[in-house]
Amino acid sequence: NSFRIELDCDIYITGSNAKLLSGELATVLGGRYVEFTIYPFSFAEFLELYRTVEPVASDAAAFQQYLTLGGMPYLANLRYAPEPCRQYLHDIYNSVVLNDVVRRNKIRDVDLLARIVAYVIGNIGTTFASTSIAKFLKSEHRTVAPETVLNYIKYCTEAYLFYQVNREDLQGKQILATN
């Protein structure tokens, strides 16, 4: 508060974890902050910036690039060059998984987490259940409880690595039965 009294300024706290403003920090700031969740670019936003780097690229080529690299704004600074972009995205992934997920949640089996993350990323847009992942891992001689799978997915969601999309085709008690 002394900064705001002595200086006419705004203070920004950034982070890649939903728990950042939970607990003590939220209590200290109580009512004096506004939270903004910022997502990667939509395709329309990506296209606008991509056109500054590749002005003659077709919409189809731009969309393919968007599907391949995603919508992280900094990629434009790398001129969408494949190798630097892949390295940048790999570094973000390692930072989020290792710092925000493994350390914050004290995960001991990092290999299991990496396998679950790879599965979820490889199955974007498809419906799956934690029990089916646990059964598959059991067939690979890795015993894991469905609750552990759910917890790992929850931790990744809290770190903004995943975004859960709720099913819209369920009604009534079917919603309660879905995991």
Across the structure, where does each feature detected by a protein language model lie?
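Structural recognition of the conserved hydrophobic beta-strand(s) that form the central parallel beta-sheet
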Residues: 10-16, 37
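Short regulatory helix/loop adjacent to the ATP-binding pocket of P-loop NTPases
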Residues: 19-35, 47-52
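Accessory nucleic acid-recognition modules appended to NTPase machines
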Residues: 80-179
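Conserved AAA+ ATPase small/helical "lid" subdomain
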Residues: 60-88
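Conserved nucleotide-binding/hydrolysis micro-motifs of P-loop NTPases
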Residues: 17-21, 41-44, 169
